[in-house]
Amino acid sequence: MKTETDKIISIPLFGDISCGKFKFMDCDIEGYIEIPKSMIGNGEYFALRASGDSMIDAGINDGDIVIVEKHPSPDNGKIAVIRVEDSVLLKRFYRLEKERKYLLHAENPVYDDIILDECDVIGIAVKVLKDL
């Protein structure tokens, strides 16, 4: 008898997300990935493929699959998927309350922080799947 922890779920894979410079994200579903339900919580999830090297010090490399929970308001310091105009980025997110701005921080010292007046948070990264 299968238990809830044995259950496999499919989540949509939306293609590449920039881990570097701004990049447009193709909104078409590229496919689905199957993961054990026990790997994630109760929420709405999707997956993106990391593109670039700005998050390498957080363990996210070019080509990794990032599992994202839809969440419009992450805590400071969370790795988030952020839409800025027609681009989507994966960065560490900080809300600068005093300045009423947002800071997007890369986890690679060769990239500068990005400071924005406004942005749209799509979700927070919760898992990274890698090929070995």
What role is predicted for each listed range?
Residues 57-61:
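A short glycine-leucine-enriched loop at secondary-structure breakpoints
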Residues 82, 104-106:
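SH3/SH3-like beta-barrel fold
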Residues 63-64, 78:
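Structural motif
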Residues 79-81, 90-95:
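Short beta-strand-centered aromatic/proline hotspots
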Residues 1-56, 87-88, 95, 99-101, ...:
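Short, positionally conserved secondary-structure boundary motifs
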Residues 47, 67-68, 81:
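Hydrophobic beta-strand signal
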